[in-house]
């Protein structure tokens, strides 16, 4: 899912969507082999799930970097330019190298062995990342699934050290499956023989059963983040101390460190990350003080688009909640942090999401008004007129509508009172233009 600058991957050469066009994984395995098997030059931590993948990936990357490793990070979706989706130690792939790798892939696809073959833009981005990470000799790659699972481009890698599953819920219904069991079954196929498989805490019983059975069939070690307990103590509005206790087999780890990521859901993601971290430390005989590593890597980590504060006056927060579970987590966080503040919510969804359920959840937020807009995705955007009709159905109110996300946020800023919290929530295709506008505006104003 490419969401930033698009010109580098011409749509005619790299179609948007080929997910259901034949044996995509078999094709990508052949391409990787022809490219010299770059995916086998480093150890892979593969992350799959419905919500929380990006945050989990960034936390793990930050920890590995703090431990002294050279770390590749592949994320989808991402915020900003196309290069943001491929990073080493949190630095984007240079545009020149990106273009070089595109040329390598194009040249290969022109050979007789791959005559008349096309790869999608997401598949191309994945292949570029593998070439780049191998060339730059990274130690580890944190690899985030796209749609996720059996037919996801990232599943073409030969082997992985870890398969990590964040919360699995209903999303991409009809593509991944029609219920939790079917979706979890599709996602479980990233598990590799003899690797370590980790599941998020509070995973549904249906998903948990599927993941555990697949891990057993692959003779993988299976770890559940339910064995990590986290409590917090607030130091300030923005900062908190995390107190954790992890039961690992017959041993126990406990400690405290600063953790500033907002969002109650980030504590669930953190439990998953801690489960991985303590297993990883055990397997690599790491000797440094663990709480120091956690504090230095996670204390000031920012995850773009995940309850991210991008402006203080007025306060503007961006969150990529775009399915029922994501919206529930967003609502819970807003109610906890801003229970009484006036709230102005800029909202837009893709038409293939369960947007009516999401609207009903958003309407539970007290002291809220709404501005309706649409994501920047011509194929999948839900028109603001249709979304406004859903709001009207449940409130009998007509909220302002804008086809342009940037015009929507401008209107929000213009009408907000000094105490209003502006919350932008919905598709990452909505957040991307708004975030770009706000950051460029901030730079222009010298903030």
Regions found by a protein language model. Name each.
Residues 1-49, 56-69, 74, 110-117:
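Short functional linear segments
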Residues 32, 37-40, 66-158, 176:
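ATP-dependent carboxylate-amine ligase catalytic core
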Residues 60-65, 133, 391, 438:
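Hydrophobic alpha-helical packing residues
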Residues 74, 200-202, 214-236, 259-264, ...:
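Beta-strand->loop->alpha-helix junctions that form or flank phosphate-binding loops
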Residues 112, 136-144, 160-256, 270, ...:
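Acidic, Mg2+-coordinating active-site environments of NTP-dependent enzymes
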Residues 140-143, 151-164, 168-172, 182, ...:
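Nucleotide phosphate-binding/pyrophosphate-handling subdomain across enzymes
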Residues 202-223, 315-316, 324, 359-421:
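C-terminal helical cap/extension that packs against the catalytic core
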Residues 427:
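Active-site-proximal loop/hinge segments that shape catalytic or ion-binding/gating pockets
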